[in-house]
């Protein structure tokens, strides 16, 4: 298990390992999976209110997201609107196709596209968007960790 590779997503860890001098064949044959994770602050359940999304939020989240939950601040959350944290993950499971893609030096985008289509991998943004739609966290928190 390796941690803290300072990458924006799980797939970019492949390039990061190669940049650190790990031979491509070792990266391809040694990895079992890759996980990127971030912590998002959770909306305080005591002061959460349903609010309309702004134009900027709809551009980021999608036009279908008309309302979100946001904390207005209370004594339970020290007037921050947030209480607690939750992890969002991006998980890439290695398979023979991905191993070949690594050896062939396919792009991060190509590997990500393959994983999303064939493994149903969710990006950090997609995982976080689910939490925003469920009212667990806010668009602001998701924007902080999303590099898409």
Q: Language-model segments: which ranges?
A:
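Short, flexible helix-loop junctions that flank or precede catalytic/ligand sites
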Residues: 1-148
């Amino acid at each position: 298990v390796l941690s803290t590779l300072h990458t924006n997503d799980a797939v970019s860890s492949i390039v990061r390992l190669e940049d650190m001098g790990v031979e491509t064949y070792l990266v391809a044959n040694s990895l079992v999976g890759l996980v990127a994770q971030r912590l998002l602050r959770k909306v305080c359940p005591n002061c959460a209110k349903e609010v309309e999304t702004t134009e900027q939020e709809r551009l980021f989240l999608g036009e279908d997201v008309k309302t979100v939950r946001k904390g207005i601040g209370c004594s339970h959350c020290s007037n921050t609107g947030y209480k607690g944290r939750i992890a969002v993950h991006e998980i890439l499971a290695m398979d023979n196709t991905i191993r070949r893609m690594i050896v062939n030096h396919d792009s991060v985008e190509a590997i990500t596209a393959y994983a999303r289509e064939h493994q149903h991998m969710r990006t950090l943004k997609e995982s976080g968007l689910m939490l925003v739609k469920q009212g667990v966290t806010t668009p602001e928190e998701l924007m902080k960790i999303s590099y898409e």
